[in-house]
């Protein structure tokens, strides 16, 4: 079976690398997430981030109040309206993360070779000799002489002088006496503690996480919950139960794999989660440096085979303080794309970085170049070999057969675009799973789902959630606009032509169900149609919000439009 390293199609010649790119307006297929914070929360900066390529906004509740994050989200909504660009929202939990408590206002200076004690006594003030931590007890954690401990600022890069590596010398009850391995000054918004090989038995959701989900998440109909320090599939079940209890049944769960326990149970986690985040910062503390690439490639491949979108963190840390990445960082970003990553999640670069917008532009540009070299056909064949054959297989349901056929047809005719009509977004995810070389325009058609006396409106959340899927551009259809007659397809092509996704004469693949129009409402066989842009009448010279399709909006917007 093909493996990750074969998904690279080299350029025709080294000289071709020097040629100027022909079309810089086409966005990268790889999705780009940004951690929003002090340097990236104004309307102006958020507008620039959206234009630069941000598709996922991460609100990290490891720090900051609900009021602070609400103000940032309100600004993001204004920025989305102003730019007419969609962006999905992600609530990142604190989980069982350990932090330093009772910090003084002044930074804490530490010297290599000195003794530093970690204590679970929460009444002690943090100082140069002792750090109180938020974990209740060291008993049963596996902490022992020789254990390695890392203490650093929130979203540490590893290159700053505000992090310290400790070696445990002695464990006495709930205190661990350590030796500092390096000199540093501990500072930053929050100090996190990472103990290698620790058995962390704290609840997967902290009390603050429960409040954030039930209040902030429910009020804002958040699209994803990113579950920090996911240890097993049971942890995902816990957060799903909480989401269901507060009316967030449509919210999806992204499992963050960032410790050894999560690595051990990665197979079950990938199967249970809706998507996966490979947190290389924290996982890199638990693994030897020479083993990190193995974990990365295996996890990416597992997610690819399962059809679960996977994002990766910690790519261009240098750009937190510098306007350009290192050559190694640039190569790393490209290799992530070639290894099968669906998205990149930026942390300190956009949270506190001096060059947030430039970072997004740079990473997107690197991703676009890597996508040009991605061997889509070899990747497609590797998935089909995994399922067993090129025809309908027991492992391939109707939707997956339709999705894989659409991607294969697009490759055969060199299509410029795949159009998918969907209610739930499921078919869009399945098409994206096969990583076609062209974009996927997903028309999300709102629908009402009935469960007894409970009615749920589908559409708005599903459209935003599609922003996490590689190559997918979702647009909303007006609920009052009916599908028969193919008019909505004409509008979809008109929009694609307006934004430069297709030109006259381009081939387009359309995936839909002939009876309902939706490709994921399949009580009968779906259809893959091959069309040419010129074959369809363009209903109007310009797309506006008066048309039945538009890129951004909420159900409130739709209701106002129809008044």
Spans of features found by a protein language model:
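Non-catalytic helical/linker scaffolds that mediate oligomerization, partner binding
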Residues: 1-563
């Amino acid at each position: 079976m093909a493996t990750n390293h074969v998904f690279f199609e080299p350029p025709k010649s080294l000289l071709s690398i020097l040629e100027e790119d022909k079309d810089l307006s086409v966005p990268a297929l790889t999705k780009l997430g940004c951690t929003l914070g002090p340097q990236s929360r104004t309307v102006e900066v958020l507008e620039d981030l959206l234009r630069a390529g941000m598709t996922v906004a991460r609100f990290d509740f490891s720090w900051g109040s609900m009021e602070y994050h609400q103000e940032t989200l309100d600004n993001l909504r204004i920025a989305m309206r102003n730019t007419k660009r969609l962006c999905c929202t992600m609530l990142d939990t604190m989980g069982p993360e350990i932090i330093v408590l009772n910090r003084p206002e002044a930074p804490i200076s530490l010297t290599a070779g000195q003794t530093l004690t970690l204590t679970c006594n929460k009444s002690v003030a943090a100082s140069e000799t002792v750090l109180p931590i938020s974990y209740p007890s060291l008993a049963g954690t596996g902490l022992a002489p020789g254990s390695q401990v890392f203490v650093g600022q929130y979203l540490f890069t590893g290159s700053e002088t505000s992090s310290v590596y400790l070696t445990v010398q002695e464990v006495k009850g709930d205190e661990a006496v350590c030796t500092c391995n390096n000199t540093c000054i501990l500072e930053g918004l929050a100090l996190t503690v990472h103990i290698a090989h620790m058995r962390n038995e704290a609840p997967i959701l902290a009390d603050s996480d429960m409040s954030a989900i039930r209040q902030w998440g429910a009020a804002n109909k958040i699209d994803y919950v990113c579950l920090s320090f996911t240890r097993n599939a049971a942890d995902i079940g816990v957060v799903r139960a909480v989401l269901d209890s507060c009316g967030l049944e449509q919210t999806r769960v992204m499992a963050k794999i960032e410790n050894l326990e999560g690595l051990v149970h990665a197979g079950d986690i990938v199967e249970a989660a809706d998507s996966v985040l490979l947190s290389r910062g924290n996982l890199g503390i638990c693994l030897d440096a020479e083993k990190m690439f193995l974990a990365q490639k295996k996890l990416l491949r597992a997610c690819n085979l399962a059809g679960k979108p996977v994002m990766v963190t910690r790519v261009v840390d240098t750009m937190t303080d510098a306007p350009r990445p290192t050559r190694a960082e640039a190569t790393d970003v490209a290799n992530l794309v070639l290894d099968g990553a669906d998205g990149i999640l930026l942390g300190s670069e956009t949270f506190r970085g001096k060059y947030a917008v430039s970072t997004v532009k740079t990473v997107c540009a690197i991703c676009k170049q890597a996508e040009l070299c991605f061997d889509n056909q070899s990747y497609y064949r590797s998935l089909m070999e995994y399922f067993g054959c090129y025809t309908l297989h027991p492992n391939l349901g109707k939707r997956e057969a339709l999705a894989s056929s659409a991607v294969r047809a697009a490759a055969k005719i060199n299509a410029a675009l795949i159009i998918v009509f969907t209610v739930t977004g499921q078919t869009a995810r399945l098409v994206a799973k096969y990583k076609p070389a062209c974009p996927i325009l997903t028309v999300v058609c709102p629908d009402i789902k009935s469960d007894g006396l409970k009615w749920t409106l589908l559409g708005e959340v599903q459209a935003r959630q599609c922003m996490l899927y590689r190559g997918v551009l979702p647009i909303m259809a007006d609920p009052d606009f009916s599908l028969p007659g193919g008019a909505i397809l004409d509008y979809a092509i008109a929009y694609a032509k307006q934004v430069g996704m297709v030109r006259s004469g381009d081939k387009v693949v359309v995936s839909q169900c002939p009876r309902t129009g939706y490709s994921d409402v399949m009580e009968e066989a779906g259809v893959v149609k091959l069309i040419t842009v010129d074959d369809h009448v363009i209903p109007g010279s310009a797309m506006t919000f008066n048309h039945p399709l538009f890129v951004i909006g909420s159900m409130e917007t739709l209701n106002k439009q129809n008044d």
